[in-house]
Amino acid sequence: VTTEAAIQVRYPKMMLSVLMAGTFTGLFGETALNMALTNLMSQFSLSAGQAQWLVTGYLLTLAVFVPVSAFLVRWFNTRVLILTALCVSLAGCLIAALAPGFAVLLLGRVIQAVGTGVILPVMMSAALLIFSVYQRGMVMGMVGIAITLAPALGPTISGFIITLFSWHAIFWLSALVYAAIILLAVKSIAPIGDITRPRIDILSLLLSSAGFSGIIYGLAILAEHSLRDPAVWGSLLAGFSALPYLPAVRRTWRCR
């Protein structure tokens, strides 16, 4: 077994640290607004269901863009893709921080989730490619900690921030973190993988997006509705029905 990494980059540790920081900040944002939902309901005159969309919308966007990023890394330079995703997440935080109403706040959340959905899979790929096989166990352990710790800490940290300031401060803080990450990324991020520009398997993308989105949406609204509600079981049924077709579609696509 070779002791060298599959792809040699100048700053592998710094590159992975930047990707982990970007992913951590994005996944922190996934749950950070949970503690502010009551305040937002009062400020914007929202129902509980409407306010919940600020969380559900983020999750649905992740469910769509994580599979899409598998194609993006084969179509675009990885360095450009990562920097763009970080800038998109930064823009989303700024929009949310300045949001005058619910619609703009939701838009900012979705835009931030787009960047997170791209960075997360790239980080996983980079962890496997820029480190040797002997280092991968430790590296993947660190990646796993970042992925699980960020959403767990979101409500705790954001609750402290809201107590001292307001919900706007959550996004201002995230924006500052993203800005620092971008500055480090300019120096440390290197391209990984080849740009092959394969044909885009639209059907697989649609099936994966529908499958994961349906499951996430169904589970999200289950908190307020009975399992007998058509919106709940219909979403779950659509999601679980779409995913089993993915392997067959992928095999058919490769045979073309």
Predicted regions and their residues:
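Residue-level hotspots within pore-lining transmembrane alpha-helices
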Residues: T25-G29, I95, A99, I111, ...
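Hydrophobic transmembrane-helix bundles of small-molecule transporters
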Residues: T163-R256
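Helix-loop-helix hairpins in multi-pass membrane proteins, especially solute transporters
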Residues: V66, A70-L203
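Hydrophobic core positions of alpha-helical segments in small-molecule transporters
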Residues: V18-A21, L54-G57, T84, L107-G108, ...
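Extracytoplasmic
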Residues: Y11-S69, I119
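Hydrophobic transmembrane alpha-helices of multi-pass secondary transporters
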Residues: Y11-L27, Y58, V88, V104, ...
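Short helix-kink/termination motifs in transmembrane helices of multi-pass secondary transporters
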Residues: T25-A36, T61, T78, I170, ...
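Short, Lys/Arg-rich, polar N-terminal cytosolic tail immediately upstream
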Residues: V1-Q8
